[in-house]
Amino acid sequence: MRIVVLFGSEMGTAEKVAEAMADELNGSEVAVFDMSEFDLADLDPQAFHIIVCSTYGEGDLPTGAEPFFEALDAQQPDLTGLRFAVFGLGDSVYDTTFNRGGEIAAAKLTALGGSQVGDHARHDASTETKPAAMGREWVRTLPFDTRQLSMTAGTAG
């Protein structure tokens, strides 16, 4: 099974978390993409998708995620069969909009037929927990067997 990690960032933290997750899944078939450069046609129901998304401004999606979600809104693709997990980044100082970027991402993908699996992670910048470290730990809890992924990486499907 292929794993696709998509990140949407404003200041680069989501990218660092996405790269840390890919490192943690070393040996698996993992590809990391900036959402701003990802083509919706490449959303593959056979792959497992990890969405790493920060929150910007008043609870908005970050600039780096806007093109991806604008394309989703415009094209309305059928995402039935697409499995995804979400790692959100935010700051609890912004109580009412804390981690809203990840929540928006999950809602949009689910509304189009995608299935969110695993715990929705919500990193809080107001804590001492480093986002990349939390991402590494969280990715190990996702409902796929990395040993199985390693064995199938590189095989024709």
Regions found by a protein language model. Give the residues of each.
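Extreme N-terminal starter segment of soluble prokaryotic enzymes
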Residues: 1-4
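A short, well-structured beta->alpha microelement
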Residues: 28-40
